UniProtKB/Swiss-Prot annotation:
Cofactor note: Binds 2 [4Fe-4S] clusters.
Cofactors required: [4Fe-4S] cluster
Disulfide bonds: none
Name this polypeptide is given: Ferredoxin-3
Organism of origin: Leptolyngbya boryana (Plectonema boryanum)
GO biological process assignments: nitrogen fixation
Domain 4Fe-4S ferredoxin-type intervals: 18-47, 65-95
The keyword Transport is assigned to this record: yes
Keyword Iron: yes
Annotated positions binding [4Fe-4S] cluster 1: C27, C30, C33, C37
Keywords: 4Fe-4S, Electron transport, Iron, Iron-sulfur, Metal-binding, Nitrogen fixation, Repeat, Transport
Length: 96
């Protein structure tokens, strides 16, 4: 299988690393990664105290919010999300 390699503007070879998972136990829901990603890959979702997903409208049930991968196919492999994550929640992989 061929390696997907890109080149930066300066000519440096670069292998994209695509988002694979987010450690939701470590995630504090700060939203930094969401702001860094302009590709609509991520979504902030709410959890209740039992760890079940709840709709944002149910504010009284929300225990905390965590980031999720909403559109993995839109990831371009830039790793901007993980570079700004204060808790190192992201796992990335190349297409190899």
């Amino acid at each position: 299988m061929a390696t997907l390699t890109n080149v930066t503007f300066g000519g440096t070879a670069w292998i994209p690393q695509f988002v694979q998972s987010i450690n939701q136990t470590k995630c504090i829901g700060c939203g930094r990664c969401f702001k860094a990603c302009g590709r609509d890959v991520l979504a902030l979702k709410a959890l209740n105290d039992e760890g079940e997903w709840v709709e944002d409208e149910d504010d009284e049930e929300i225990e905390r919010k965590v980031m999720t991968i909403a559109n993995r196919d839109k990831c371009i492999g830039c790793e901007a999300c993980s570079r700004v994550c204060p808790k190192n929640c992201y796992t990335h992989e190349s297409l190899n």
